[in-house]
Amino acid sequence: MELGIYSFGDSGTHSTRQRLADLVAQARYADEAGLDVIALGEHHRPDFTLSAPELVLAAISAVTERIRLSTAVTVLSTADPVRVYQQFATLDQLSGGRAEIVAGRGAFTESFGLFGYDLREYEVLFDEKLRLLLTLAREEGPVTWRGRTREPLDDALVTPRALQPVLPVWVGVGGTPQSAVRAGRLGAPMFVAIFTDPAPARGLVEIYHRAAANAGHDPAGLRVASGGHMYVGHTSQGARDEFYPYYAEYLSKLPQFSGGMPRAAYDEWIRAGLLVGSPQEVIDKIMNHRELLGISRYVGQFDVGGMPAGMVDKSLELFATEVAPVVRKESA
Amino acid sequence: MSARVAVLGAGKVGTVLARLSVAAGRPTAIAGSGDPAALGLIVDVLAPGAVPMTGADAAAQADIVIVAVPLARLETVPAAALKGRVVVDAMNYWPPVDGVLPAWEDATPSSSEIVRDLLGVDVVKSFNHMGYHELDAWTRPAGDLDRRALAVAGDDGAAVTAVAELVDAMGFDPVPLRPLGAGRVLQPGSSDIFGADLTRAELLSTLDALGVAPAAACP
């Protein structure tokens, strides 16, 4: 079982320079503390510092030894798969074979306008680009490709190649069943975002495995990971109280909480499955994901809502030193 | 005979509504974008018992058609096949996720009034103010103290009654509102109803505080 963290670099009141420096330091700590994965997402909004995660991952690669360098997610619909492959192949070479991509459609839509894409095309954009990226990752030789969403490629050599024989490309799924079908048909590992109760995602995992079997993929090549918001405190009540103001602010981005997330709703989310609590509570919730969904990796969004770096560091330390060793032991 | 239900949209919301409709004993058809094999697998896992069909076929054979597609793709809904059916708008407009859609920007009417005008058929607004996880988790038998309420807003009394019966059979207390535009208070960002998962008494008192009276006819 692999354990890791992910971030969008929520700005809070911090300067971009400070947030990026904190992230690199936190990734370095995660590496030293033995966590398996650091994943960076991208949002193209002023309340987040990360729109170019591959650059930050490159900085992290220079100060870490073992930790895998991933994304959460790469908004592939509005990117060029050729360029994405080149960037992560370069990161893979720089890092000694630690790069990965989690390709997804993203939660927000700003990147469509910024990069000149039509939101109504989001389905075909993601589908075509994912297939092209997988082709680039899986096939060594020149690539010929035709599609609607970018210029054709004719015997194109895309260089450099990744250091790993096949650069891992996961498909990120937010709950849309068609996305699980796609991941299975393509035989790609699937990352599922889960914030409260993991039980409804059982259907997505079943769809994923059945779609993969129907397409003839070897079940041994399939993997499921999950991840969501996470805060670990010394005590159950302390964790809830400390994290609430930041989470309530963060979730005011959701339509149902546009006036702020009520404490009762927050407590209900924690009861249903949100990973906020003591180390033991977080251990139990990750093990529940494993039992229900068969995950072999969990990544927690560890710096939600512009918390002060001290709070983030403390939660991260508890995750790395008190949660991760127990989950590894229980899942071994 | 039970009303036949068609759900247009096999995403997060549509698959839950189809599952609830099957559980309520209604003959249920479901349509989605993309290829039929993918839809068949999705329905088999998430809404077994529902029959995958094309949108036009599903709508044509149904009494109640629930539209649950992304608003940005409303033009994929077979409007002609909706004529003469009770049509339910389960959708919401929320620009951070949908993108900015000119038809719904600066809309003072309910988004369902715009859906009605674009589809060219009468619609009833319901299911929109509870999340799909919650719709799945909160079904309760009639009389259960924990039962949650779903508002049902529309202009046509018979259509509102038909949808209210379905809501009740699915496991929620229906609260009828008239006219359709009254459903504006059910939308994201406009009141304390959206995403609040209220009981019938709580929904009624919230509506009262907003100055919205429920429609008299209650099944």
Regions found by a protein language model. Give the residues of each.
Chain A
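N-terminal small/glycine-rich loop or linker at the start of catalytic domains
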Residues: 1-14, 108-111, 150-165, 258-271
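N-terminal beta1-alpha1-beta2 module of alpha/beta enzyme domains
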Residues: 1-70, 167, 332
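Conserved, mostly hydrophobic/aromatic
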Residues: 3, 30, 34, 42, ...
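Hydrophobic faces of well-ordered beta-strands that scaffold small-molecule active sites
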Residues: 3-7, 38-40, 69-71, 99-103, ...
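Active-site mouth loops of central-metabolism enzymes
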Residues: 7-20, 74-82, 165-175, 269-279
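Acidic (Asp/Glu)-rich catalytic clusters
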Residues: 31-32, 57-66, 88, 92-98, ...
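Internal, glycine-rich beta/alpha segment that forms the wall or movable "lid"
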Residues: 80-188, 199-206, 213-215
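An alpha-helical appendage that flanks or caps ligand/catalytic pockets
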Residues: 120-158, 199-296, 328-332
